[in-house]
C-alpha cells in the first residue's frame, strides 16, 4: 500500500494567544504529516507572523471571513490525498496522526474520521460532564445517524470531499461540521473514533456558558439532521 499523504489544515482568525502552542504540539507530534497549512482568515493581530515563524508551516490567506471558507482555502492550497482539520486553539496528542493512518489503511470505505474534544482548561466537575457527553450522548447520536463530526478534530479523503462539493460557505459556524458529515455519509463511511482525542481550550464554554453552548451545538446538530440546515446563523468570535 502506498504511504498515505496527510495534509493538516488549521483555520486561524486572531489566534495570537493560542496558535504558538497549537503549532508547537503539531510540529512535535505530527512528524508523519505530509504538510501543515495555516489559513489566516483575515486576522488583525499577529497570527500570521507567529505561524510564519515555524519553518515547517506554510501560511496562506483567506480574506472571506468564516471557518468554512478558511477550510476550503486550505483544501485548495494543500495536496494530500487525506486532509485533516484542527482548530488553532487545539493541542495535538502524540498518537493522533498514527490513529488516523491506522483507520484509513484498514478501511478503504472510510471517507471521514472524527473524534472527541478534551478540554484542557476546565474544572474537574466540568470534565465529568463532558466525559458523560462523549461517552453516552455522543454515542447515541452517532448510532442514530451513523455520522458525527467535530469541526476542530476531523479528517477526510480529498476525493470524497470534492465529490460532495466541499464545504458550504453559506454556513458560518454552527452546524457546519454536521452538514459536512451528513453529505459525506452519502458517499462513504463516516467513523467517530473515541480514541481520536484532540485537546482544546474551553474558551467558548467559558465565554458563552456551558449550558448555552451545549444547547446551541445540540439544536443545530438536530436541525442539520432533520432539516438539512442549521438554525443559528450568527455567532460570536471568542478569543
Spans of model-derived segments:
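N-proximal low-complexity "stem/linker" segments adjacent to membrane-targeting elements
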Residues: 1-25
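Short, acidic, metal-binding catalytic loop of nucleotide-sugar glycosyltransferases
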Residues: 24-33
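A conserved acidic beta->alpha catalytic loop
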Residues: 25, 40-48, 90
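Glycine-rich, basic loop-to-helix element that forms the pyrophosphate-binding segment
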Residues: 62-78
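Short aromatic/hydrophobic "clamp" motif used to bind/position activated sugar donors
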Residues: 83
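Conserved donor NDP-sugar-binding/catalytic core segment of glycosyltransferases
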Residues: 95-125
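Short, flexible, basic/aromatic active-site loop/helix in glycosyltransferases
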Residues: 114-121, 127-151
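Acidic donor-binding loop at a coil-to-helix junction in glycosyltransferase catalytic cores
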Residues: 173-180
Amino acid at each position: 500500500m502506498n504511504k498515505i499523504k496527510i495534509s493538516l489544515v488549521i483555520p486561524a482568525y486572531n489566534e495570537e494567544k493560542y496558535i504558538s502552542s497549537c503549532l508547537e504540539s503539531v510540529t512535535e507530534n505530527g512528524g508523519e504529516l505530509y504538510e501543515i497549512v495555516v489559513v489566516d482568515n483575515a486576522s488583525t493581530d499577529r497570527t500570521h507572523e507567529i505561524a510564519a515563524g515555524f519553518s515547517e508551516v506554510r501560511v496562506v490567506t483567506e480574506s472571506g471571513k468564516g471557518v468554512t471558507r478558511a477550510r476550503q482555502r486550505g483544501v485548495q492550497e494543500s495536496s494530500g490525498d487525506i486532509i485533516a482539520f484542527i482548530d488553532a486553539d487545539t493541542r495535538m496528542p502524540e498518537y493522533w496522526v498514527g490513529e488516523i493512518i491506522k483507520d484509513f489503511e484498514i478501511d478503504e470505505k472510510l471517507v471521514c474520521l472524527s473524534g472527541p474534544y478534551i478540554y484542557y482548561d476546565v474544572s474537574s466537575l466540568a470534565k465529568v460532564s463532558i466525559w458523560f457527553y462523549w461517552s453516552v450522548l455522543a454515542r447515541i447520536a452517532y448510532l442514530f445517524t451513523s455520522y458525527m463530526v467535530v469541526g476542530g478534530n476531523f479528517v477526510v479523503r480529498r476525493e470524497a470531499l470534492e465529490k460532495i462539493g466541499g464545504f458550504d460557505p453559506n454556513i458560518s459556524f454552527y452546524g457546519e461540521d454536521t452538514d459536512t458529515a451528513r453529505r459525506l455519509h452519502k458517499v462513504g463511511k463516516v467513523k467517530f473514533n473515541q480514541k481520536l482525542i484532540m485537546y482544546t481550550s474551553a474558551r467558548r464554554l467559558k465565554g458563552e456558558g456551558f449550558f448555552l453552548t451545549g444547547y446551541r451545538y445540540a439544536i443545530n446538530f438536530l436541525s442539520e439532521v432533520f432539516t438539512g440546515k442549521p438554525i443559528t446563523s450568527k455567532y460570536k468570535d471568542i478569543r
